[in-house]
């Protein structure tokens, strides 16, 4: 059987509202078992993640003393080598090494201990320019190493002798803020005192105020909360030298654009602005013209969809959707799956249906309490459940590398939404599967999205080749069909 199943699923955790409907998770190995490599990655994530009411605090500083002449690489605690196939989204590089950028040794140690062996294309393009202090407008696919592309130069440029906020990363969702802060903390752990803080709406404001009373070098935040802290005079940003807008298209949409304008006005005039996104609508161009000074433009988007994601559709009626999902669960070899619905109400209804079928699942949406969202995100990322039902809350930048299947239970209306949804699989050049349940009313949308993205969504075959989305079916890396 492809996913965890029990005859009597039970609700576990804080309450039924916390998004955790789960039975026991099937052991790794065998059909749907995930394999040893995925399990090792989950264990690494489990060790790395800490959540404290939405505020990430630097773990006890790790200062590594290395004597002159020591081979410092021998002291590293490297994760298991990732032997899964990778596509040219992340392998078509210029052959640079992280050492080529003259980074601090302590930062290099954190990079290598993250399992980052060589810079991806977006990192090769971005890191040297960001280190020079120039503004950047970067367009690259989700899941190709954007976080590292800005966090590495950001950390390199910190002056740890100073006790003020020197860099800010603004992201559109709380979950993404937690994820980016965890990465930042891990990469900087050998730097001996780099203080990283995440602050988001929905968490205790008093805790954030107390945290900012101590030294903080890097703030990773959602727009509304950081602007609130700036206006209260708690977050002092007069020494900020770099601000990053991750998922810039969302941050500069109608929901956030005025808040972002207000934040920029509080910063020094000589600050550096880095914009990263997969899509750049007119709102981003307008912001760029107003605030960026001769930006260096990076465009790694000759095609929009990830090379490693195979896309299918199944033509169904609304009443057939749950039965079709049940069939997919039984036939696919799922490491972890994310299932998208178009409303919070449908998320909860579907999660309940899935548990009634005997499969364990979590669910998450924007109307849940923040502590429940944090718990679901943390536990799913750590591999405690195989299936997650969610809204588009979970599309922006969330990186869970064990996810190899994305299912659009409800087909999205916008091409941009579709692009971000299917980008939850096939992360960092790995393989993934995107399956769309299409009703009669969705048929025009399907055609429109194919045309806008320049991609092909094929009818689902009776048997899906496991080599398209299961890493263990590749004994050695292969190139993209000779390109």
Curated annotation (Swiss-Prot):
Positions of ATP binding: 140-147
SMART domains cross-referenced by the UniProt entry: DEXDc, HELICc
Motif Q motif, which positions? 96-124
Q: Where is the Helicase C-terminal domain?
A: 308-468
- Please provide, alphabetically and separated by semicolons, the GO molecular function terms listed in this UniProt record: ATP binding; ATP hydrolysis activity; mRNA binding; RNA helicase activity
In this chain, composition skew of type Polar residues spans 55-66
Family to which this protein belongs: Belongs to the DEAD box helicase family. DDX6/DHH1 subfamily.
Q: What is this protein called?
A: Probable ATP-dependent RNA helicase DDX6
């Amino acid at each position: 059987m492809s996913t965890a199943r029990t005859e009597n699923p039970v609700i576990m955790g804080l309450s039924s509202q916390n998004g955790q409907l789960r039975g026991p998770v099937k052991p790794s190995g065998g059909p749907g078992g995930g394999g040893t490599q995925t399990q090792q990655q989950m264990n690494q994530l489990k060790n790395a993640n800490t959540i404290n009411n939405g505020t990430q605090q630097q773990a006890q500083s790790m200062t590594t003393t290395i004597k002159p002449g020591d081979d410092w690489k021998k002291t590293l605690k490297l994760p298991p080598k990732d032997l899964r196939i990778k596509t040219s989204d992340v392998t078509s590089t210029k052959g640079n090494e992280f050492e080529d950028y003259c980074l601090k040794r302590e930062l290099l140690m954190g990079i290598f201990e993250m399992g980052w062996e060589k810079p991806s294309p977006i990192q090769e393009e971005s890191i040297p320019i960001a280190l020079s202090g120039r503004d950047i407008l970067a367009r690259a696919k989700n899941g190709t190493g954007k976080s590292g592309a800005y966090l590495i130069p950001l950390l390199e440029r910190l002056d740890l002798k100073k006790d003020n906020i020197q860099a800010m990363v603004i992201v559109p969702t709380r979950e993404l803020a937690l994820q980016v802060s965890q990465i930042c903390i891990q990469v900087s752990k050998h730097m001996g005192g780099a203080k990283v803080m995440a602050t988001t709406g929905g968490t205790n404001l008093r805790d954030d105020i107390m945290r900012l009373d101590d030294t903080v070098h890097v703030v990773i935040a959602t727009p509304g909360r950081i602007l609130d802290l700036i206006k209260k005079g708690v977050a002092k940003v007069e020494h900020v030298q770099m601000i990053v807008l991750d998922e810039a298209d969302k941050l500069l949409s109608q929901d956030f654009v005025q808040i972002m304008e207000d934040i920029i006005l509080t910063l020094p005039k000589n600050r550096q602005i880095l914009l990263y996104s997969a899509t750049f609508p007119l709102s981003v161009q307008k912001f760029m013209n107003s605030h960026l000074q001769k930006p260096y433009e990076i465009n790694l988007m000759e095609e929009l969809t990830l090379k490693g994601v195979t896309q299918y559709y199944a033509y169904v009626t609304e009443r057939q959707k749950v039965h079709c999902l049940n069939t997919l669960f039984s036939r696919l070899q799922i490491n972890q799956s994310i299932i998208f619905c178009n409303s919070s109400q449908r998320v909860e209804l579907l999660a309940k249906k899935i548990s009634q079928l005997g499969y364990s699942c979590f669910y998450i949406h924007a109307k849940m309490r923040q502590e429940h969202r944090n718990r679901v995100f943390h536990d799913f990322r750590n591999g405690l459940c195989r299936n997650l039902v969610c809204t588009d809350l979970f599309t922006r930048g969330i990186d869970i590398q064990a996810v190899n299947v994305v299912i659009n239970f409800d087909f999205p209306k916008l091409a941009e939404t579709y692009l971000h949804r299917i980008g939850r699989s096939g992360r960092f050049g790995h393989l993934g599967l995107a399956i769309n349940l299409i009703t009669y009313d969705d048929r025009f949308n399907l055609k429109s999205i194919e045309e806008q993205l320049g991609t092909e969504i094929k009818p689902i075959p009776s048997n899906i080749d496991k080599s398209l989305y299961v890493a263990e079916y590749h004994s050695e890396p292969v190139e993209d069909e000779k390109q």
